[in-house]
Amino acid sequence: MSLSDPIADFLTRLRNGQAGMNKVVFVPHSKVVRSILDILLAEGYIEGFTEESKSSGIKYLKVCLKYYNCAPVIKKIVRVSRPGKRVYSSADRLPKFYNGLGVYIVSTSQGVMLDYRARKLGIGGEILCGVF
């Protein structure tokens, strides 16, 4: 099965998993999704993740979701740039998500990183998603 937008599929699986109060969700493996998960783990939005393979050899990422007082830690996660409409921004024009309470995840020439790190390094890129 080929996905036209694996990032949107990943974000939807996270949202649906948290809406159903699931402890874990499985997402198809890709380099970009793994980079986003590294960022979410470092920022404390998820408990952790591991790489697993099914018997057919397909790689999946097992994501352990995080809750606080029986409520999901991720309040809102939205896809910004999509295949039909890419959204790029320079370092000085990178917006703030929820007035700085949330973060944007940006794909830059130096890899996938958070918006405030991209501003600090002075590099722009494609705004992948916002997390609050």
Swiss-Prot record:
The gene is rpsH. One of its GO terms (cellular component) is ribonucleoprotein complex. Keywords: Ribonucleoprotein, Ribosomal protein, RNA-binding, rRNA-binding. It comes from the Bacteria. Signal peptide: none annotated. Part of the 30S ribosomal subunit. Contacts proteins S5 and S12. One of the primary rRNA binding proteins, it binds directly to 16S rRNA central domain where it helps coordinate assembly of the platform of the 30S subunit. GO terms for molecular function: rRNA binding; structural constituent of ribosome. The keyword Zinc does not apply. GO terms for biological process: translation. This is Small ribosomal subunit protein uS8. Pfam families: Ribosomal_S8. The lineage of its organism: Bacteria, Pseudomonadati, Pseudomonadota, Alphaproteobacteria, Rickettsiales. Belongs to the universal ribosomal protein uS8 family.
